[in-house]
């Protein structure tokens, strides 16, 4: 399969990362979780006591980060950060750092450079509208806030993180608001993206639906 790029956008907890990951494996193309990149920046910023408003320090931090992927795991400066970036403290702060214009500009540039070198499936908040505007395949994956909160709660409990449903739902709704209302590249469905509500479908059913659309071409 030559010269293919697939953009998958949607709110937190909709299942887009899991879906994109499986599609990448099925089609044998590179999967890039752009959310992991923002999470990694958030992790490193918190470790270095850099606030979201400290633009110059954030830019210097990002420029010092050598970001790559090993399978589905994000590697920064040679260290696997996949587990660290899934901690609740990152969930609670990532939208603040992701809303910073200069952060988005630097990471979008990295993402676009990757897409020029490889066939990719990327998931995030602004893939179809900004990062891969010309992607031939665009999908917007969503689900109700309650369904997404249940999924996130299950995921966190499986990792041994003890948290209640009400707190997870609150976090999901707060992230939705921040992601949809930020000034720079807000979460929104691209006009040419296919909308898929996953509330009543399994991951496998959604993957099959997307793969069938791609294979028809």
UniProtKB/Swiss-Prot annotation:
Could you tell me the keywords of this UniProt record?
ATP-binding, Cytoplasm, Kinase, Nucleotide-binding, Transferase
- Pfam families, alphabetized: Cytidylate_kin (PF02224)
Ligand binding (ATP): 10-18
Among the GO molecular function terms of this UniProt record, one is:
CMP kinase activity
The reply on keyword Ribonucleoprotein is no
Q: Which GO terms describe its cellular component?
A: cytosol
According to its UniProt record, the EC number is 2.7.4.25
Reaction it catalyzes: CMP + ATP = CDP + ADP; dCMP + ATP = dCDP + ADP
Q: Does the keyword ATP-binding apply?
A: yes
The record's subcellular locations are: Cytoplasm
- By its UniProt entry, which CDD domains does this protein fall under? CMPK
Set out the biological process GO terms recorded for this chain's protein. Answer: nucleobase-containing small molecule interconversion; pyrimidine nucleotide metabolic process
Q: Which family does it belong to?
A: Belongs to the cytidylate kinase family. Type 1 subfamily.
Q: What is this protein called?
A: Cytidylate kinase
The major lineage groups are: Bacteria, Bacillati, Bacillota, Clostridia, Eubacteriales
Q: Which gene encodes it?
A: cmk
